[in-house]
């Protein structure tokens, strides 16, 4: 049974699988600099710490110095925007989970390291933007996860303490941020754990996927038209 009044979700690896689009953007960025493609499998292991870190990892993989990181990042952002999220997918059960939470008047928010400019368009593409009261991206504030300020900021806007909220994510950054905020948290194995043993990351609870989360919270299944 869910007792929290506010659920803060990570985005990539938690609500959506965006790696196919990210991989296209990374490979297009590398091609711009006449470098070989990284491929989807590599990109899947590199995500979770923001787009700048993703680009840095791609350059390191291509044995390039980070001197042109800013330029490469700009190329990546343009390439990612050009994908129009054509290959990203919601994880199964996400719309039903969000609808069930909204029916119980649970406030919902997103705290992600994804650049702010991409968040609302992708939520709109999947018709789930109406469920979220607050959306905080990786460049919206001066810091990003694992710094807990994203979570403090959302709680302040919601007018409630972190103890009334719960963080749901898929990475060490999510759990470190939640623990630093003294906020309850759940880690999902379905995401981009980067090959880690998720049970050892300090999460209060580790579940397989969105459906397991719905059952854990004893929420009814909703039919979404």
Indicate residue ranges for each PLM-predicted region.
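N-terminal helical cap/lid subdomain that shapes the substrate entry/recognition surface
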Residues: 2-96, 103-104, 117, 125
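Asp-based, Mg2+/Mn2+-dependent phosphohydrolase catalytic module
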Residues: 1-6, 99-102, 116, 120-225
């Amino acid at each position: 049974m869910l007792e929290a009044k506010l659920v803060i979700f990570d985005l990539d690896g938690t609500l959506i699988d965006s790696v196919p689009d990210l991989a296209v953007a990374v490979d297009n960025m590398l091609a711009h600099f006449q470098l070989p493609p990284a491929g989807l499998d590599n990109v899947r292991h590199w995500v979770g710490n923001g787009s700048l870190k993703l680009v840095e990892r791609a350059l390191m993989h291509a044995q390039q110095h980070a001197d042109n990181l800013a330029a490469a990042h700009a190329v990546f952002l343009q390439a990612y925007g050009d994908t129009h999220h054509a290959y990203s997918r919601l994880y199964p059960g996400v719309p039903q989970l969000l609808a069930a939470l909204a029916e119980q008047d649970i406030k919902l928010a997103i705290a992600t390291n994804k650049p702010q400019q991409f968040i609302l368009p992708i939520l709109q593409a999947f018709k789930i933007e109406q469920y979220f009261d607050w959306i905080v991206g990786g460049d919206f504030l001066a810091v990003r996860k694992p710094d807990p300020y994203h979570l403090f900021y959302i709680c302040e806007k919601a007018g409630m303490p972190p103890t009334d909220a719960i963080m749901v994510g898929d990475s060490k950054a999510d759990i470190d941020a939640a623990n630093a905020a003294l906020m309850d948290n759940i880690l999902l194995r379905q995401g981009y754990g980067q090959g880690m043993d998720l049970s050892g990351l300090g999460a209060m609870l580790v579940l397989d996927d969105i459906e397991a989360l719905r059952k854990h919270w004893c929420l009814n299944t909703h039919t979404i038209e």
